[in-house]
């Protein structure tokens, strides 16, 4: 304090000396001299005040943008997302703004803007003192108020938002002072803008930042929103409508107030006549024309591939944070792998098939409620449970915390709701919340993805049947893959030296496994989807094609469940896997995207390439700031991959193959090899199909939003009936399009000398009709495998020992077999 006191005393003396000197200026002077001194003093004080505001003297006025920030000023811009074929498929934005250059705008707009908003624009340097004096005079004389802000001042206000984004300091807390500080800062910024930018640049920046209402920021978005044209295509009358809105975007909005907008448009046109930018004859003609709009407000959810775009946003979130970008304001150009034409084919295929699936589902259940448990009993409180997870229920609970009757009343009170309909899209009905939930949960859902195995590029992505109604993306939803998981069982078998022509017996067997939930050993036995075992030794190629569960589980034990899980992870499965014997039948949840990536590893000769959604990103200045790397890794031997390619093709060629119906869609394209694998989880809750060719891998899933909602029979609910046709319709369109001729190719001959045709070219297996014989079946069960809690075999029992725990005769499905008929081979 002792050091500060002398400084304060010195400052006090200097201030007193200044005021003494200033008073002496007036003494003995003429009145006009005193007047001049007063005026000069005010001018000096004004500029000293502006300087103090600019430098935030003693933190009294708050921070202001510096010269560098003004010179390199940037605005919030929408990021654009492009397809691989160069089509703009959507935007990410908070304010829908896409900048344009001065030359990209019709000159009529510039003329209308200057003539109306700032007629002395080319004469002032940011502040129009003539206009300011006129505005003061009008205010004093109570005339109609005129705007005193120049275009440059408006730009300063729009771009830097002094009223919201910057503090007004300690003095800003005083009543009436805050607005003075804000206006002062806008004047200072306007002057700096004139010093750092040309008039043309200022006009362009203004046109790109100004708000035209309807979430249209900037001239490009406004022209698209109101007239569905580019700024270059604007006519004089259209330009006048947009300029007229700048005075008050709501009051003069052509949608909200068409009469006001028309009157304001004609005022703008008359201003153009007054300044010689429009002839009287042109005005007389144009002013009689009604405003013709092609109005369409653009949202984040316009365009195509909505689920894909959400996935891209999720993927880029971390990249944006790490690289100091904002996806919704940084004006990035994002180039993706999706092909707009293939996406269109995929969406059409999904809707075409799902309409039929929904018809089958509705006919199948009739008036019954489909949310049933495994014993076919309606699940009590199912709809109520869904309702309690809805925002409306949480709102009602907060409003009526101790009044459940009121909550129930409002949940069951009819009101207008928006629902999905296949024929009409979004429909509006008078319905209660509970009834709308009942209506919507009856829908079956789907997902689809197409991927290039060599690049990992995702070419088509369908997350569900309608984004507006169901925003949850089923491509990344976790569901049981069923028999599609057998790919990894057989791949590991190939890794360990087996071949497609090696045989395993289709027979009943059981095993003791440790059930962690019950904390004890239980007996588990796999069953085939057709309900019986042939007892035949079947080539692995046929067992895979027919999706025989007993062989898959036996192989799982031979190869080791842990090894199979490791192989699955190497090939592209990222989700955790429960290493139990049932894993061989697809008991652990995974998603369609990672499954397609793993199947791509087989198509790519054993080389794993992580799926790619974004190829490159360019910033607002045209600089490339991201390029997707191509990381390829050989994760399974080429020999295993080649043999699995043959196995997959067996699914479409072997007698009884579950994927044979794919030939009905792609059979005419004989220059292309296709393999496939179907899958159906327990109770037909999840139906899958994966299709593989050398250059393209496709996958589809079909099921209910909740696992308890499903078909009751494999004849309707299996993967070959529900999911496969989506891929089939898609492939018909793609392979028939000359633009995608590159996808029409064959796998070719083996590249390794140690691969012989005898390994995969074996005689087709034809399932013979088998007599029902307990003795014969018992012969096939020669041993029982007992596993510890980690799934490892610990002991083996003979057939005689087995009877102590329960003979095959006691197993309900051990001997049952139907007569020859169409059956589902891909159920768990």
Q: What do the predicted segments below correspond to?
A:
Residues 122-132, 217-219, 279-284, 494-518, ...:
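Short, well-structured active-site flanking segments
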Residues 98-103, 437-446, 469-488, 501-504, ...:
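Short active-site loop at a secondary-structure junction
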Residues 141-167, 229-232, 296-307, 498-564, ...:
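Conserved catalytic neighborhood of penicillin-recognizing serine enzymes
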Residues 336, 340-356, 387-452, 457, ...:
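A penicillin-recognizing enzyme superfamily signal
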Residues 2-82, 120, 357:
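N-terminal type II signal-anchor transmembrane helix
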Residues 144, 279-337, 341-402:
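Non-catalytic structural connector segments
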Residues 75-285, 301, 307, 466, ...:
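Peptidoglycan glycan-strand catalytic modules in the bacterial/periplasmic cell-wall system
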Residues 112-114, 272, 346, 455-456, ...:
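Active-site SXXK
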């Amino acid at each position: 304090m002792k050091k500060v006191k002398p400084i304060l005393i010195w400052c006090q003396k200097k201030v007193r000396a200044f005021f003494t000197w200033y008073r002496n200026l007036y003494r003995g002077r003429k009145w006009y001299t005193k007047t001049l001194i007063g005026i000069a003093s005010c001018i000096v004080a004004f500029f000293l005040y502006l300087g103090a505001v600019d430098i935030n003297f003693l933190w009294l006025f708050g921070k202001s943008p510096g010269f560098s920030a003004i010179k390199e000023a940037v605005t919030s811009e929408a990021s654009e997302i492009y397809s691989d074929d160069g089509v703009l498929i959507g935007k990410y934005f908070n304010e829908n703004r896409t900048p344009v250059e001065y030359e990209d705008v019709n000159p009529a707009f510039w003329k209308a803007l200057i003539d109306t908003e700032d007629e002395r624009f080319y004469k002032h340097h940011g502040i129009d003192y003539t206009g300011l004096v006129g505005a003061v005079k009008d205010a004093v004389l109570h005339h109609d108020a005129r705007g005193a802000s120049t275009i440059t001042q408006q730009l300063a206000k729009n771009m830097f938002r002094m009223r919201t984004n910057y503090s007004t300091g300690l003095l800003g807390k005083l009543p009436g002072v805050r607005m003075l500080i804000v206006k002062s800062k806008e004047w200072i910024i306007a002057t700096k803008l004139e010093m750092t930018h040309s008039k043309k640049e200022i006009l362009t920046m203004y046109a790109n930042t100004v708000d035209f209402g309807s979430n249209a920021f900037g001239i490009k978005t406004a022209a698209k929103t109101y007239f569905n044209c580019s700024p270059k295509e604007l006519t004089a009358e259209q330009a006048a409508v947009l300029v007229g809105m700048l005075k008050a975007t709501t009051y003069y909005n052509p949608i909200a107030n068409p009469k006001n907008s028309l009157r304001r448009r004609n005022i703008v046109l008359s201003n153009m006549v007054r300044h010689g930018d429009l002839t009287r004859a042109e005005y007389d003609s144009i002013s009689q024309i009604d405003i013709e709009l092609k109005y369409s407000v653009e949202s984040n959810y316009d365009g195509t591939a909505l689920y894909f775009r959400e996935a891209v946003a999720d993927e880029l979130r971390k990249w944006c944070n790490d690289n100091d970008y904002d996806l919704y304001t940084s004006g990035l150009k994002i180039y993706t792998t999706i092909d707009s034409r293939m996406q269109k084919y995929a969406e059409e295929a999904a809707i075409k098939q799902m309409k039929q699936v929904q018809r089958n589902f509705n006919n199948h259940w009739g008036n019954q409620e489909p949310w049933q448990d495994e014993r076919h009993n309606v699940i009590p409180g199912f709809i109520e449970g869904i309702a309690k997870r809805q925002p409306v229920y949480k709102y009602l609970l907060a409003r009526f915390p101790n009044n459940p009757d009121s909550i129930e009343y409002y949940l069951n009170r009819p009101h207008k709701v928006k629902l999905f309909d296949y024929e009409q899209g979004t429909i509006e009905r008078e319905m209660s919340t509970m009834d709308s939930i009942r209506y919507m949960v009856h829908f079956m859902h789907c997902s689809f993805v197409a991927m290039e195995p060599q690049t990992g590029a995702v070419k088509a992505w369908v997350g569900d049947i309608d984004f507006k109604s169901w925003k949850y993306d089923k491509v990344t939803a976790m569901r049981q893959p069923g028999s599609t998981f057998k790919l990894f069982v057989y791949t590991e078998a190939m890794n360990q030296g087996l071949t497609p022509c090696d045989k395993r017996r289709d027979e009943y067997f059981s095993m003791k496994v440790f059930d962690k939930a019950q904390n004890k050993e239980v007996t588990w036995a796999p069953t085939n989807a057709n309900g019986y075992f042939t007892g035949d030794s079947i080539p692995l190629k046929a067992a895979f094609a027919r999706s025989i569960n007993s062989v898959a589980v036996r192989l799982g034990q031979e190869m080791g469940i842990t090894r199979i899980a490791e192989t699955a992870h190497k090939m592209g499965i990222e989700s955790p896997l429960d290493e139990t014997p049932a894993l061989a039948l697809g008991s652990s949840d995974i998603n369609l995207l990672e499954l397609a990536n793993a199947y791509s590893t087989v198509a790519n000769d054993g080389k794993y390439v992580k799926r790619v959604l974004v190829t490159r990103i360019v910033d607002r200045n045209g600089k490339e700031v991201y390029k997707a790397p191509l990381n390829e890794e050989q994760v399974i031997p080429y020999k295993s991959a080649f043999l699995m390619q043959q196995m997959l093709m067996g699914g479409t060629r072997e007698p009884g193959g579950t994927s044979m119906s794919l030939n009905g869609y792609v059979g005419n394209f004989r220059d292309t090899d296709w393999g496939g694998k179907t899958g159906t989880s327990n109770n037909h809750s999840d139906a899958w199909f994966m299709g593989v060719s050398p250059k393209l891998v496709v996958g589809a899933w079909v099921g209910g939003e909740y696992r308890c909602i499903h078909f009751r029979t494999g004849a309707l609910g299996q993967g070959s009936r529900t999911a496969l046709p989506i891929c089939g319709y898609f492939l018909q369109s793609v392979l028939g399009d000359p633009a995608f001729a590159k996808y029409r190719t064959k796998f070719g001959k083996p590249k390794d000398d140690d691969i012989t045709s005898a390994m995969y070219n074996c005689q087709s297996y034809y399932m013979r009709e088998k007599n029902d014989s307990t003795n014969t079946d018992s012969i096939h069960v020669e041993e029982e495998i007992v596993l510890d809690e980690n799934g490892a075999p610990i002991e083996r029992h003979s057939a005689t020992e087995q009877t102590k725990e329960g003979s095959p005769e006691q197993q309900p499905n051990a001997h049952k077999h139907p007569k020859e008929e169409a059956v589902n081979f891909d159920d768990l």
